[in-house]
A protein has these predicted regions:
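Bacterial N-terminal signal peptides that target proteins for export
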Residues: 1-9
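Bacterial N-terminal signal peptides
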Residues: 9-18
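N-terminal alpha-helical interaction modules that lie
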Residues: 23-110
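Soluble non-cytosolic domains of exported or imported proteins
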Residues: 47, 109-113, 127-131
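Residue-level recognition of tetratricopeptide repeat
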Residues: 66-68, 111-113, 143-151
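Short coil/turn linking the two alpha-helices of tandem helical-hairpin repeats
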Residues: 77-86, 119-129
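Mid-length scaffold segments of soluble, non-membrane domains
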Residues: 107-122
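Conserved binding-pocket/active-site segment within a compact domain
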Residues: 121-153
Length: 153
């Protein structure tokens, strides 16, 4: 009789534990690495979850600024479950400033750090479909194969 009770108890436990869904956060959305860059003035002035200012867009577009700080800015801007349009806003800024004409132009002709910014924004904009973002990030990695930041993002 004890054996039967143990088997039933084990079956009930198995059913209970297997019925729970496993869920995992993505490092894209669950790692607030921008906190490590809190002493950078440009990172400190970005409001988490808010649309960036022109000063922030300019920092992201400037080729001489460190890519790690650029990624920290984007990380702080973050994502929203219902989606965002930061990648389109970034592309619009680049177009307005004459840096690129289209996303295709950005992909083919621009430096890897700009492409990585666009890729990270695109991934955060549509967290459930990162195919384009991954393609852009791979291209950025080809342009900067030795960059730790580019490789880790």
């Amino acid at each position: 009789m004890k054996t039967t009770h143990r088997i039933i108890a084990c079956l009930i436990a198995l059913i209970c534990f297997s019925a729970q869904r496993a869920a995992a956060d993505s490092p894209l959305t669950s790692t607030d690495f921008h906190q490590a860059y809190a002493d950078e003035p440009i990172v400190a002035q970005v409001e988490k979850g808010r649309t960036p200012s022109d000063e922030t867009w300019a920092y992201l577009a400037a080729p001489d600024n460190p890519v790690a700080v650029k990624m920290a800015i984007i990380n702080k801007i973050g994502w929203a479950f219902e989606g965002k349009n930061s990648s389109q806003l970034f592309l619009s800024y680049l177009k307005r400033k004459g840096i690129c004409k289209t996303e295709k132009d950005l992909y083919k002709k621009r430096p890897g750090d700009l492409l990585l910014c666009a890729a990270y924004f695109k991934a955060l904009d549509n967290y459930f479909n990162v195919e384009d973002a991954a393609r852009m990030a791979r291209k950025a990695k080809k342009n900067h194969p030795d960059s730790y930041t580019v490789n880790i993002i």
